[in-house]
Amino acid sequence: MLYPSIDSLMDKLDSKYTLVTVSAKRARELKEDDQRGPLVGKPKSFKPVGVALEEIVEDHLQYERKEQ
């Protein structure tokens, strides 16, 4: 995968573990709910994980870290 780059993704989130968690949850949402499309206008990727990563890099997704 060339786009988005790992560097641009890491600028948006605080750790690679957060990146994996957020993108996996969003990809699952995209796969399960066909009525809601991607938040990006015209995604370059056809796979749900790729679309989720594009949404992260374009600031369409937000997450909230829960304090323990």
Swiss-Prot record:
<keyword id="KW-0548">Nucleotidyltransferase</keyword>
<dbReference type="GO" id="GO:0003899">
    <property type="term" value="F:DNA-directed RNA polymerase activity"/>
</dbReference>
<comment type="similarity">
    <text>Belongs to the RNA polymerase subunit omega family.</text>
</comment>
<dbReference type="GO" id="GO:0003677">
    <property type="term" value="F:DNA binding"/>
</dbReference>
<dbReference type="InterPro" id="IPR003716">
    <property type="entry name" value="DNA-dir_RNA_pol_omega"/>
</dbReference>
<dbReference type="GO" id="GO:0006351">
    <property type="term" value="P:DNA-templated transcription"/>
</dbReference>
<keyword id="KW-0240">DNA-directed RNA polymerase</keyword>
<dbReference type="Pfam" id="PF01192">
    <property type="entry name" value="RNA_pol_Rpb6"/>
</dbReference>
<comment type="function">
    <text>Promotes RNA polymerase assembly. Latches the N- and C-terminal regions of the beta' subunit thereby facilitating its interaction with the beta and alpha subunits.</text>
</comment>
<dbReference type="GO" id="GO:0000428">
    <property type="term" value="C:DNA-directed RNA polymerase complex"/>
</dbReference>
<dbReference type="InterPro" id="IPR036161">
    <property type="entry name" value="RPB6/omega-like_sf"/>
</dbReference>
<keyword id="KW-0808">Transferase</keyword>
<protein>
    <recommendedName>
        <fullName>DNA-directed RNA polymerase subunit omega</fullName>
        <ecNumber>2.7.7.6</ecNumber>
    </recommendedName>
</protein>
<comment type="subunit">
    <text>The RNAP catalytic core consists of 2 alpha, 1 beta, 1 beta' and 1 omega subunit. When a sigma factor is associated with the core the holoenzyme is formed, which can initiate transcription.</text>
</comment>
<keyword id="KW-0804">Transcription</keyword>
<dbReference type="InterPro" id="IPR006110">
    <property type="entry name" value="Pol_omega/Rpo6/RPB6"/>
</dbReference>
